[in-house]
């Protein structure tokens, strides 16, 4: 079903979240609302009974065309804690492996009365395509699409930063590693810019840097890690995505670690209270050494905890936005 050209695809007529495809174009107030809502859901995870009834009677379908243990599991937990029914589609054994198109798969899932799709796909733009073509009553959440976006990872990273560092307006944040292939890097740069971070640094070899980062995201680019890490408050390490690389981008993983790997010595260039983050999975000895990943400044496991709360916030807000839009359209029809 084509989207209304007068309204941004992700928002309803009242500016509420309806789909969550990308952080691009979303206002600061909405990102802050997601963070505030997630903060309130963190308390749910500390209870003996970790459930609230916000999505009772709703069905959330996780459609993962690309493998992911952490993202899929946290989305499942988030939906279950909101009391939704959850279906997780194993694409490798589904009809898509027998030639069924993406649209046909979604139509069949719609026929099962799913209220929301969480989609992960190797093609950039897949989540947007799905949001444009599903029934108007179905919300679509992007669980990662190609190199394009991973908006819930971006927001859980922002929640991690805010809970450890307060507001964003005095911070220096460095994103280090395979920027070229990273949807996480793109989502983080957009979120940091929108939330008012004044100093966003990107550190990578030239071969792993997209063209035009400075103009598009307002970041500072460094090819020397030691220079880029000086006095930063937050270090976000990214893994080398070998599965998306073609030959010639790197001489070797050992050379990458020597020049860009986060060691205890290199971390000392950052502020003494700097935090270390990583979206996972971690390649120890490639982009980060174990002493840092497991050290006192690491908040990597906190990111996983906060990820459940962020996904609870996004699922509940998108479902609420869909319900509001449906009510508005019914009132207009009357």
Curated annotation (Swiss-Prot):
Residues holding L-aspartate: 98, 183, 239
Record has NAD as a keyword: no
Enzyme Commission numbers on file: 2.1.3.2
Pathway entry: Pyrimidine metabolism; UMP biosynthesis via de novo pathway; (S)-dihydroorotate from bicarbonate: step 2/3
Any one GO molecular-function label of the UniProt entry: aspartate carbamoyltransferase activity
GO biological process: 'de novo' pyrimidine nucleobase biosynthetic process; 'de novo' UMP biosynthetic process; amino acid metabolic process
Catalytic activity: carbamoyl phosphate + L-aspartate = N-carbamoyl-L-aspartate + phosphate + H(+)
InterPro entries listed in its UniProt record: Asp/Orn_carbamoyltranf_P-bd (IPR006132), Asp/Orn_carbamoylTrfase (IPR006130), Asp/Orn_carbamoylTrfase_sf (IPR036901), Asp_carbamoyltransf (IPR002082), Asp_carbamoyltransf_Asp/Orn-bd (IPR006131)
Source domain of life: Bacteria
Amino-acid positions noted as binding carbamoyl phosphate in the UniProt annotation, renumbered to this chain: 70-71, 120, 150, 153, 280-281
A GO CC annotation given for this chain: cytosol
Broad EC category: transferase
Key words of the record: Pyrimidine biosynthesis, Transferase
Pfam families listed in its UniProt record: OTCace, OTCace_N
Family the entry assigns: Belongs to the aspartate/ornithine carbamoyltransferase superfamily. ATCase family.
Subunit structure: Heterododecamer (2C3:3R2) of six catalytic PyrB chains organized as two trimers (C3), and six regulatory PyrI chains organized as three dimers (R2).
Function in brief: Catalyzes the condensation of carbamoyl phosphate and aspartate to form carbamoyl aspartate and inorganic phosphate, the committed step in the de novo pyrimidine nucleotide biosynthesis pathway.
Protein name according to UniProt: Aspartate carbamoyltransferase catalytic subunit
Organism expressing this protein natively: Pseudomonas paraeruginosa (strain DSM 24068 / PA7) (Pseudomonas aeruginosa (strain PA7))
């Amino acid at each position: 079903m084509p989207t209304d050209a007068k309204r941004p695809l992700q928002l309803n007529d009242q500016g509420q979240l309806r789909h969550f495809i990308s952080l691009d174009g979303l206002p600061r107030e909405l990102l802050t609302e997601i963070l505030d809502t997630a903060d309130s859901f963190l308390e749910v995870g500390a209870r003996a009974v970790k459930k609230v009834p916000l999505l009772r009677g709703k069905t959330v379908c996780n459609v993962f065309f690309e493998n992911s243990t952490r993202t899929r599991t946290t989305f499942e937990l988030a939906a279950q804690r909101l009391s939704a029914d959850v279906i997780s589609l194993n694409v490798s054994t589904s009809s898509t492996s027998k030639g069924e198109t993406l649209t046909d798969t979604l139509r069949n899932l719609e026929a099962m009365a799913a209220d929301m799709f969480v989609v992960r796909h190797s093609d950039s733009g897949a989540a947007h395509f799905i949001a444009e073509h599903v029934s108007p009553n179905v919300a679509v959440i992007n669980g990662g699409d190609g190199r394009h976006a991973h908006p819930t990872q971006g927001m859980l990273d922002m929640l991690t930063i805010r809970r450890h560092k307060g507001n964003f307006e005095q911070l220096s944040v460095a994103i280090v590693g395979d920027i070229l292939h990273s949807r996480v890097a793109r989502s983080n740069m957009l979120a940091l810019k929108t939330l008012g971070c004044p100093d966003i640094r990107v550190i990578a070899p030239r071969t792993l840097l997209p063209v035009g980062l400075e103009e598009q995201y307002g970041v500072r680019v460094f090819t020397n890690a030691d220079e880029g890490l000086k006095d930063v408050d937050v270090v976000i390490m990214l893994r080398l995505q070998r599965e998306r690389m073609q030959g010639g981008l790197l001489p070797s993983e050992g050379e990458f670690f020597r020049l860009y790997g986060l060691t205890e010595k290199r971390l000392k260039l950052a502020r003494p209270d700097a935090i270390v983050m990583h979206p996972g999975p971690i390649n120890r000895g490639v982009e980060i050494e174990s002493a840092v990943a497991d050290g006192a400044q690491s908040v990597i496991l906190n990111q996983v905890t906060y990820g459940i709360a962020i996904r609870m916030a996004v699922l509940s807000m998108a479902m609420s936005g869909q319900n509001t839009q449906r009510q508005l359209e019914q009132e207009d029809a009357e």
